[in-house]
Amino acid sequence: MTTSAVKVLIHGASGRMGKALLRLAAEDQTLQVVGAVVGRSPSQRVVDGVPFFAASELGGAPAFDVAIDFSLPQGFAPILALCAQRGKPLVSGTTGLDEAQRAALRDAAQQIALVWASNFSLGVAVLTELVERAAGTLPGWDCDILEAHHVHKQDAPSGTALTLGEAATGSGAQPRYVSLRAGDIVGEHTVQFTGLGERVELVHRATNRDIFARGALHAAKLLIGKPAGSYRVRDLVL
């Protein structure tokens, strides 16, 4: 690890994404995880050199350069407030946020650099660009977004499906959504444009959850030093 390693606080460290972030960050010499926040009091206070904290102890988290949040909606407000209070950027992939929480995000973007995204993969960033272009180029065509995820995913449609829908709506389409929860599907999104006698399908399939964690870690590095504002993944990586 270099002396100039980016100090990262991981919020939601006990979840699928949190565990992937911890594992991949440990392999990256440019990153130092200075704290991991979990929902309840941790059974071990230090794991592989990383201090663990309960969500109720968030205010006592050590100094960090950027926070990465993959938690639940009910845990989102405290990490957003902490970053705003300390003037540190935030990368968040927590989905299922309500309108009040989205408004809080917009307000916080006046103080800090932040990126909220339902999906941090480079492929989905490209897919979003393609959906935006297709919707604007194919006026009047039906637009349907089909998404499939593992049985444990609670929100539907997925945050990524809604993001793709926003891209389509912004270019004039009126998307409809279909959701499937089955097995251990990591994530599949199909955006279908249907006209008279022809159909266009844009598809992204994730086969490994690590792509999301890698993307979030990469976004965290790129967010360092950015002026206050709300950034999209594609603003940072494309």
Curated annotation (Swiss-Prot):
Active site location: H149, K153
Family matches, as InterPro entries: DapB_C (IPR022663), DapB_N (IPR000846), DapB_N_CS (IPR022664), DHDPR_bac (IPR023940), NAD(P)-bd_dom_sf (IPR036291)
Subcellular location: Cytoplasm
Catalytic activity: (S)-2,3,4,5-tetrahydrodipicolinate + NAD(+) + H2O = (2S,4S)-4-hydroxy-2,3,4,5-tetrahydrodipicolinate + NADH + H(+); (S)-2,3,4,5-tetrahydrodipicolinate + NADP(+) + H2O = (2S,4S)-4-hydroxy-2,3,4,5-tetrahydrodipicolinate + NADPH + H(+)
CDD domains referenced in this protein's UniProt entry, alphabetically: DHDPR_N (cd02274)
Signal peptide: none
One Pfam family per UniProt: DapB_N
Statement: the UniProt record of this protein carries the keyword Transmembrane helix: no
Binding site for NAD(+): G12, A13, S14, G15, R16, M17, G93, T94, T95, A117, S118, N119, F120
Coiled coil, from the record: none
Residues that bind NADP(+): R40
EC number, as in UniProt: 1.17.1.8
Assigned keywords, A-Z: Amino-acid biosynthesis, Cytoplasm, Diaminopimelate biosynthesis, Lysine biosynthesis, NAD, NADP, Oxidoreductase
Binding sites annotated in the UniProt record for (S)-2,3,4,5-tetrahydrodipicolinate: H150, G159, T160
One Gene Ontology cellular component: cytosol
BP terms from Gene Ontology: diaminopimelate biosynthetic process; lysine biosynthetic process via diaminopimelate
Similarity comment: Belongs to the DapB family.
PANTHER family cross-referenced by the UniProt entry: 4-HYDROXY-TETRAHYDRODIPICOLINATE REDUCTASE 1, CHLOROPLASTIC-RELATED, DIHYDRODIPICOLINATE REDUCTASE
Name of the featured protein: 4-hydroxy-tetrahydrodipicolinate reductase
Organism name: Xanthomonas euvesicatoria pv. vesicatoria (strain 85-10)
Gene name of this polypeptide: dapB
